[in-house]
Amino acid sequence: MSDIAPVTNTPYIPPTPEVGLPLWLLAELTYRCPLQCPYCSNPLDFAKQGQELSTEQWFKVMQEAREMGAAQIGFSGGEPLVRQDLAELIAEARRLGFYTNLITSGIGLTEEKIIAFKEAGLDHIQISFQASDEQVNNMLAGSKKAFAQKLEMARAVKRHGYPMVLNFVTHRHNIDRIDKIIELCLALEADFVELATCQFYGWAHLNRLGLLPTKDQLVRAEAVTNEYRARLEAENHPCKLIFVTPDYYEERPKACMNGWGNIFLTVTPDGTALPCHGARQMPIQFPNVRDHSMQHIWYDSFGFNRFRGYDWMPEPCRSCDEKEKDFGGCRCQAFMLTGDAANADPVCSKSYHHGIITQARDESETATQTIEELAFRNDRNSRLIAKSS
């Protein structure tokens, strides 16, 4: 299309071919958010983070990433809608040739903004829900108006020709109503539905005892989802259901981000560049886009090279015949659960720390924590956590 600028520079190809291109750029525009979901993946101390990047600084990030081969950009947060320059950022990403995603709670979205984003060239909008039940949704979101606003905006997104992509984070307090969740999605004429069981990073890790479903809950929920899949397929229905399980019930770890610094690059609101959105908590000095080019960050910085390849691996990963499949699992999870990011992901049954995972499974069977007892993601709690750390 004539309104898209071609990538004028040939992508830099590193001397070590095992380093992939940063194809997927996650632009965390802000940590500000009107909601306070207790499973948010943002850092616990988000309230103390530095000043947000300016419009021009984000333009530079996108330009440099595109020149390196980045193809897709996700605008996320916090809530990206609080940025007044969001339409400008979308338009620039479109001009550069990115496929553009907006990942939003829908709070703050209006029909006028949807039209403006469409004109700017936005390709895709994903709206998240907390539950199919208004009371539970609003309790988890920390807003009495959240559910009604989400419904209204989901319908508006559909009216304006976007594929309707809905995301439900499931956990022990809503997973038993997964049939109601799917029915709501069908009523909204969703094209894609991600039923993503809570992943335990950030605030979700803090609240794990009150969020991790039991194994029986997961088995039932997946069975219900499969029944709906079969029915939809028989009816030739276009809606696709994606069921994401927590790796706490697996015996082998996920190949997190397809390998550290291999395909995925996050830039946080203050410009810190990360190989995944959870890596900020590690005791590693990650580079900042204010100080370094994206090329230096991706290929030369210590933070992005720390866990590339296999030479860093201790046992049991070093001699494992599965290391090329899972890269030792998730470095952030290894750090959170064992205190050392170089350890094998405790999800793996070969890990010396696998007992941490089996203990969490056992605890889920007797957990009694209510929604009201969860630590909600808000400025007050974040400041308290930052002060005590």
Curated annotation (Swiss-Prot):
Keyword NAD: no
UniProt keyword Nucleotide-binding, yes or no: no
UniProt keyword annotations, A-Z: 4Fe-4S, Iron, Iron-sulfur, Metal-binding, Oxidoreductase, PQQ biosynthesis, S-adenosyl-L-methionine
Disulfide bond positions: none
GO MF annotations in UniProt: 4 iron, 4 sulfur cluster binding; cyclase activity; iron ion binding; oxidoreductase activity; S-adenosyl-L-methionine binding
Enzyme Commission code: 1.21.98.4
Cofactor binding notes: Binds 1 [4Fe-4S] cluster. The cluster is coordinated with 3 cysteines and an exchangeable S-adenosyl-L-methionine.
GO BP terms in the entry: pyrroloquinoline quinone biosynthetic process
Residues that bind [4Fe-4S] cluster: C33, C37, C40
Catalysed transformations (reactions): [PQQ precursor protein] + S-adenosyl-L-methionine = E-Y cross-linked-[PQQ precursor protein] + 5'-deoxyadenosine + L-methionine + H(+)
Cofactor(s) this protein cannot do without: [4Fe-4S] cluster
Main function: Catalyzes the cross-linking of a glutamate residue and a tyrosine residue in the PqqA protein as part of the biosynthesis of pyrroloquinoline quinone (PQQ).
Classification via NCBIfam families: PQQ_syn_pqqE, rSAM_more_4Fe4S
Family according to the record: Belongs to the radical SAM superfamily. PqqE family.
Record HAMAP family: PqqE
Subunit structure and binding partners: Interacts with PqqD. The interaction is necessary for activity of PqqE.
Name of the protein: PqqA peptide cyclase
Lineage: Bacteria, Pseudomonadati, Pseudomonadota, Gammaproteobacteria, Pseudomonadales
